[in-house]
From Swiss-Prot:
Subunit field text: Homodimer. Interacts with PriA and DnaT. Component of the replication restart primosome. Primosome assembly occurs via a 'hand-off' mechanism. PriA binds to replication forks, subsequently PriB then DnaT bind; DnaT then displaces ssDNA to generate the helicase loading substrate.
UniProt keywords, alphabetically: DNA replication, DNA-binding, Primosome
NCBIfam families: PriB_gamma (TIGR04418)
The protein's name in its UniProt record: Replication restart protein PriB
Presence of keyword Amino-acid biosynthesis: no
Gene Ontology terms, MF aspect: single-stranded DNA binding
Organism field: Bordetella pertussis (strain Tohama I / ATCC BAA-589 / NCTC 13251)
Family as reported in the entry's similarity comment: Belongs to the PriB family.
Length: 107
């Protein structure tokens, strides 16, 4: 299984581009902050992760303001072939109510 669900804030939102197959593609940099319990002890988690949205979801996210809080779901894949770095491939994204974004999104 390769599924990741995360609450995150949009730190960067790139310009719309298209894949060689002609699909709209949007690169984002997301930041996540949370506190979890690991081995019975609280642990603060702060991370940034590169993400990409393709197709209709890319079009929906293209005007997302920086700082928008979202719930995202997708899968992890290598950033490039044979790379040890990973990228989150978004399959769903929902703006969190009260965030800087306008309407909730569902991909």
């Amino acid at each position: 299984m390769n599924t990741l669900e995360l609450s995150a804030r949009v730190l960067e939102c790139g310009a719309m581009r298209h894949t060689p197959a002609g699909l709209p593609a949007l690169e984002l940099l997301l930041v996540h902050e949370s506190e979890v319990v690991e081995a019975g002890h609280p642990r603060r988690v702060e991370l940034t992760i590169s993400a990409v949205a393709l197709g209709d979801l890319a079009l929906l996210l293209a005007d997302t303001p920086l700082g928008t809080e979202m719930q995202v779901q997708g899968f992890l894949a290598p950033a490039r072939k044979d790379s040890v770095k990973v990228k989150l491939h978004l399959q769903q994204a929902r703006r969190i109510a009260g965030s800087m974004g306008r309407d909730p999104l569902v991909g």
